Amino acid sequence: MLPVVALVGRPNVGKSTLFNRLTRSRDALVADYPGLTRDRQYGQAEVEEHPFIVIDTGGINGDEQGIDVKMAEQSLMAIEEADAVLFLVDARDGLTAADHGIADHLRKQNKKIFVVANKIDGIHGDSAVAEFYSLGLGEHVHQIAAAHGRGVTQLLTIALTPHIEELGKPKVEEGEASEGEFDDAFFSDKDVELTEEELAKKLEDEPQENDKIKLAIIGRPNVGKSTLTNRILGEERVVVYDMPGTTRDSVYIPMERNGREYTLIDTAGIRRRKNVTDVVEKYSVIKTLRAIEDANVCLLIIDAQEGISDQDLSLLGFILEAGRSLVLAVNKWDGLEDHEKDRIKTELDRRLGFIDFARVHFISALHGTGVGHLYESVEEAFVSATKRISTAMVTKILDMAVFDHQPPLHQGRRIKLKYAHAGGYNPPIIIIHGNSAKKLPMSYKRYLMNYYRKSLKMMGTPIRIQFKDTLNPFAGKKKLNYTEQKKIARATQGYKKD
C-alpha cells in the first residue's frame, strides 16, 4: 500500500508550497494569506523510486471559529490517516503557542514525526531553529526554503526515504488525459532480474481464477457509490456484517453471486449514521486509494450528469498505476435526454479512449437498471487478469505479431525480438527479450499490447509489457586480426608446429 505523509502546521507556514514542490505540481493554491487552504489536497510524490501520498492540510491555530473549525478538524484527521507527519514551523516567526499546541497533539500519536523549519532563506538557519528543539519531537529540525527548493532534497533522502521504504510499495496529474500520460502504467523498460525460483514463488502468490473476487467500488463523492452498494447487497439479500480488513478504515463485506464468492470493499461508509458530518466524508480519499491497492477489480463510477472530471481521471490513474482490473459504470443514466447521452458517449471516447480494454456500462443505481450486467464484466476482468499463460504461447504470439508487422529499424539495424514469457498476473505481465528491445518506439509497443490482448482474449485488465535487452556475448571483446584468429584456430584444433 502507498504510504501517506501529511503536511501539518499553522496557517501560512508554507505547507502548500512544499506540497507543490513534492508533487511537482501546482495543485495547491499558494498565496501569502493565512487560511487559503480549506479542503485537503492529495497528491502523489516519489523519493528514490518509492511513491507515496502527500496530504496538504489547512492550518491549525487553536483559536478557530466558524469554517476554520472544519479546517482544523480536517488537519487533525489527516494526522490520524497518515503514516508519517511533516510538522512545518516558520523559522522567521519563531516558536509560537500554536506550535506548542500542535506538538502536544502529535506527541499522543503513534506516528513518525519530522519537524521542518521553513523559510530559512536569508537568515542564519541554525540560530533560527534552535528553539524548535524544545518541542521534543525527534533529534533533528530539518531546515528548508520550500519556495526555492533549498533543503527539500535532503529532507526527502535523509529523513523520509528510510521510512517510505518500510511503509509501502507501489502519478497522475489532473487535467486532460491522453494516451501518452498513462503509457508508464502499461510499459516498462526496467530490467527484470527474477530467478526461476523467485518467479515461480511470485506466480504462486498471485490470485487464481476461482479465488474470491475483491471488488472495490470507486468514485467521487455523490456519484452513487452508496446507492450502488446498497443495490448490490439488497438484490442478493445477504446478511451484512463488518469484517475488519487489513486496510485501515475500509469495511469488507462478503457476498455471493452465481456461485462466485465476492468481497465487496466499501469505501463509501454505507453503515454510517445519518448525522455524520460532511467533513468525515472528505476523508474517504485515503480509504479509496488503499482500497484500490487491495482490490482485484475496481468498479469506477462516473456521474453521467456531471461528465468526466479531473478527479475521475486522478482515480483512474491510481487504478492503472496499481495495475488493477477495471470496469466503468456511468451512473444516473436514466435521467438524461438523448442528446445528453450522445454527448457523454462522445466525451468517453475522446477522454478515455486509451482504456478501450475496460467494459463500459450505463446504469441507474437508484432503479437498478443495468446493475445485473456489471457482474459479467467484473468476472470477465478478474478471469483475464488471473489467466495463466505459458512461455510457448506468449512466444508464439510474439512471432505472429512480428511476422505480421516487423519492428522498425534502430540506427540502421532491425530490432530483433527473440522470445517472451509471463512475469506475473493481476495484472498480466509479459516480458519480451530481444536485441535493442528497449529501443522500440511507443507505437510498436502499443501494437504488441493490442496484439496480445486480441490473441489472449483479455478484457477488463491492463496488460503490462516489459522489455529486456539480450546481452551480446561478444560485447567488450577485442576484435582479432587474421593472424591472431589463425593462431587460436590452430591451438583449438590441436595443431602443432614442426
From Swiss-Prot:
Amino acids binding GTP 1: 9-16, 56-60, 118-121
Residues that, per the record, bind GTP 2: 219-226, 266-270, 331-334
MF terms (GO), sorted A to Z: ATP hydrolysis activity; GTP binding; ribosome binding
Keywords assigned by UniProt, alphabetized: GTP-binding, Nucleotide-binding, Repeat, Ribosome biogenesis
EngA-type G domain mapped to chain residues: 3-167, 213-386
UniProt-listed SUPFAM superfamilies: P-loop containing nucleoside triphosphate hydrolases (SSF52540)
GO annotation (BP), single: ribosome biogenesis
This protein's record includes keyword Membrane: no
Protein role: GTPase that plays an essential role in the late steps of ribosome biogenesis.
Subunit structure: Associates with the 50S ribosomal subunit.
Protein name: GTPase Der
Organism of provenance: Colwellia psychrerythraea (strain 34H / ATCC BAA-681) (Vibrio psychroerythus)
Lineage of the species this protein comes from: Bacteria, Pseudomonadati, Pseudomonadota, Gammaproteobacteria, Alteromonadales
Annotated gene: der
